[in-house]
């Protein structure tokens, strides 16, 4: 059994800036996972944005706290705690924190990359 906490050294050592706006860490990745690409947590400060980008895998953004404006291709929607957004392979997507507190999301990616 593998259990990771967001404050574990193995997680903190993976900290990176994701697409220009979010501070992200890999909770689990391909070093462990076989059928899933990764599970990451990302924090967007108010006014920050995960800039529009296209990935070669499908993803799910799940909002834990805060809120933001989620864009997938030509659709835009306000998202908040408990919302899960499916992002198909090859879709242009972005998330802007338009609230007044951090927007914290879990990102699950397929293994297609």
Q: Regions from the language model: what does each represent?
A:
Residues 32-35, 45-48, 67, 111-113:
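Short, charged/polar surface micro-motifs in flexible loops or helix N-caps
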Residues 56-57, 75, 91-92, 101, ...:
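A generic "binding-loop/recognition-motif" signal
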Residues 41-45, 55-70:
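Short, conserved beta-strand element in jelly-roll/cupin
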Residues 75-89:
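Short acidic-glycine-tyrosine-enriched beta hairpin
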Residues 1-36:
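A short, N-terminal "cap"/entry segment at the start of jelly-roll beta-barrel domains
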Residues 50-52, 70-71, 87, 93-100:
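Short beta-strand His + acidic residue motifs that chelate non-heme Fe in jelly-roll/DSBH
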Residues 42, 60, 86, 101-113:
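A short hydrophobic beta-strand segment most commonly corresponding to one strand
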Residues 24, 39-55, 89:
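Conserved short histidine dyad/triad with adjacent acidic residue
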């Amino acid at each position: 059994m593998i259990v990771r906490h967001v404050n574990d050294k193995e997680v903190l050592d993976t900290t990176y800036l994701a697409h220009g706006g979010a501070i992200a860490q890999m909770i689990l990745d391909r070093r462990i996972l076989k059928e899933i690409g990764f599970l990451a947590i990302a924090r967007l400060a108010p006014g920050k944005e995960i800039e529009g980008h296209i990935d070669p895998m499908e993803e799910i953004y799940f909002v834990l706290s805060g809120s933001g404006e989620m864009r997938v291709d030509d659709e835009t929607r306000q998202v908040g705690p408990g919302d899960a957004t499916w992002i198909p392979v090859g879709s242009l997507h972005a998330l802007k924190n338009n609230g007044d507190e951090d927007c914290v999301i879990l990102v699950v990616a397929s293994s297609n990359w």
